[in-house]
């Protein structure tokens, strides 16, 4: 089961990297959605129903820039943690360490489901310690995830470290 998830995840990340810049069609009219939400952003949509595939993009420059994956990293990180044995399954209870944090949802025992819902950093920091940097680097390379660099001098490497992915 986990092998199929790995293959699907790897295919998703690799396919998102392989997009050729020259084949992109700019969609400036999509800016209204970001403006209405009061945010900066980019979107890349690949329509593979066509042959060859059509790639539509709003803000091509931003789409090419690399960013910290932040909370989006929970998805591959959860799979790495399961594969490494840091957590058994989505039902395992991860005991709260008792440290009061700003967000109330973090101040309780967690499962994978609640940790993902609340973006519970202490859970994922625990996984990172258990996995270790060398194994994390190997996992990242195995799915061709961004620059595959989990090094950090402070904090969570997917937030404050060197790990970068394209928008």
Write out the residue ranges for each language-model feature:
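Extracytoplasmic
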Residues: 38-40, 62-64, 68-73, 89, ...
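Bacterial N-terminal signal peptides that target proteins for export
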Residues: 1-7
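Active-site SXXK
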Residues: 66-91, 115
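Mid-domain, small-residue-enriched loop/turn segments at the edges of structured enzyme/sensor domains
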Residues: 104, 111-112, 126-167
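Beta-lactamase-like hydrolase cores
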Residues: 19-65
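Active-site-proximal loop and beta-strand segments within enzyme catalytic domains
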Residues: 83-110
């Amino acid at each position: 089961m986990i092998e199929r998830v790995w293959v699907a995840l790897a295919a998703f990340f690799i396919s998102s990297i392989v997009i050729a810049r020259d084949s992109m069609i700019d969609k400036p009219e999509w800016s209204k959605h970001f403006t209405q939400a009061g945010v900066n952003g980019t979107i890349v949509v690949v329509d593979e129903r066509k042959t060859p595939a059509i790639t539509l993009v709003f803000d091509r420059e931003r789409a090419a820039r690399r960013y910290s994956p932040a909370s989006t990293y929970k998805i591959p990180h959860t799979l790495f943690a399961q594969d490494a044995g840091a957590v058994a399954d989505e039902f395992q209870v991860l005991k709260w360490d008792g440290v009061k944090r700003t967000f109330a949802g973090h101040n309780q025992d967690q499962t994978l489901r609640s940790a993902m819902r609340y973006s519970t950093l202490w859970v994922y920091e625990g996984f990172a310690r258990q996995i270790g940097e060398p194994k994390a680097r190997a996992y990242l390379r195995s799915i061709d995830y961004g620059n595959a660099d989990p090094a950090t001098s402070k904090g969570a490497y997917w937030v404050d470290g060197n790990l970068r992915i394209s928008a």
